[in-house]
């Protein structure tokens, strides 16, 4: 219980980041084309790299920015492949919500680094309060649809334990203790790994876009980690 006794600003950063990001992400998907909303929201790794220059003791070098931009290009290739852009893109409320996602998650990550004295165990409290706020938002804005079979219940449990559970603890540890520029650039591997899992289970095919994304995202992560790789060779 001791790790839950944190300053109000810590709770504001933790809950604001976790709940705010997901609230605006779902809002973006409801009010803009999913591809466009996803691509805008996925500016957060690049913003983490850029905002890291504001942290004490951190130096932003050209290869950090180049690596993050290369990773963004890889994610863009993957997300935009096969899309028809015959119609011009028009700004919608969902686009602004997606930008809020990017700003919230990058801001949360950078501020978590700044609040490095806060134990990672406190994330459990942030998740609990976020879950309560998410329930209230669901009841106000959405219709309730229950899982239809045991597999769907298992999928819901898996999401709660993994991507919206354990992952938050790992992320907190990473942004507080890891190489934040390399972490930001390598985050572009998330959509790539999702696509590779779909390919592995036969739900998607291996295309030039996937191959190009592999090269760009991997290359971007390596480029952003140059100083880390140099240090390991000394």
Regions found by a protein language model. Give the residues of each.
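Hydrophobic/aromatic residues within transmembrane alpha-helices
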Residues: 28, 54-60, 115, 122, ...
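Cytoplasmic-side transmembrane-helix entry/capping segments in multi-pass membrane proteins
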Residues: 6-15, 60-72, 95, 117-128, ...
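Helix-helix packing/entry segments at the starts of transmembrane helices
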Residues: 22, 37-43, 111-132, 161-200
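Juxtamembrane helix-entry segments on the extracytoplasmic side of multipass membrane proteins
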Residues: 3-8, 80-102, 140-158, 205-215
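Hydrophobic/small/kink-forming positions within alpha-helical transmembrane segments
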Residues: 15-19, 23, 45-50, 76, ...
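Specific transmembrane alpha-helical segments of multi-pass solute transporters/efflux pumps
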Residues: 1-36, 40-41, 77, 160-178
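Hydrophobic transmembrane alpha-helices of multi-pass small-molecule transport proteins
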Residues: 51, 60-82, 127, 131-134, ...
């Amino acid at each position: 219980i001791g790790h839950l006794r944190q300053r109000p600003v810590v709770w504001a950063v933790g809950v604001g980041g976790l709940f705010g990001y997901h609230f605006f992400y779902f809002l973006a998907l409801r009010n803009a084309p999913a591809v466009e909303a996803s691509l805008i929201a996925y500016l957060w790794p690049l913003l983490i790299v850029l905002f890291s220059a504001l942290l004490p003791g951190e130096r932003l070098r050209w290869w950090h920015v180049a690596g993050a931009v290369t990773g963004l290009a890889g994610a863009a290739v993957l997300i935009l492949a096969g899309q028809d852009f015959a119609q011009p893109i028009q700004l919608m409320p969902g686009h602004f919500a997606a930008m809020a996602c990017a700003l919230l998650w990058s801001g949360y990550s950078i501020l978590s680094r700044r609040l490095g004295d806060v134990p990672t165990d406190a994330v459990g409290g942030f998740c609990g309060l976020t879950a309560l706020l998410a329930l209230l938002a669901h009841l106000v804005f959405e219709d309730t649809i229950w899982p239809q079979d045991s597999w769907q219940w298992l999928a819901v449990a898996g999401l709660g334990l993994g991507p919206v559970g354990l992952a938050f603890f790992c992320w907190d540890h990473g942004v507080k203790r890891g190489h934040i520029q390399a972490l930001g650039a390598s985050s572009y591997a998330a959509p790539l790994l999702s696509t590779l899992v779909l390919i592995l289970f036969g739900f998607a095919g291996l295309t030039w876009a996937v191959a190009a994304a592999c090269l760009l995202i991997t290359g971007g992560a390596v480029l952003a980690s140059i100083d880390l790789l140099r240090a390991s060779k000394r």
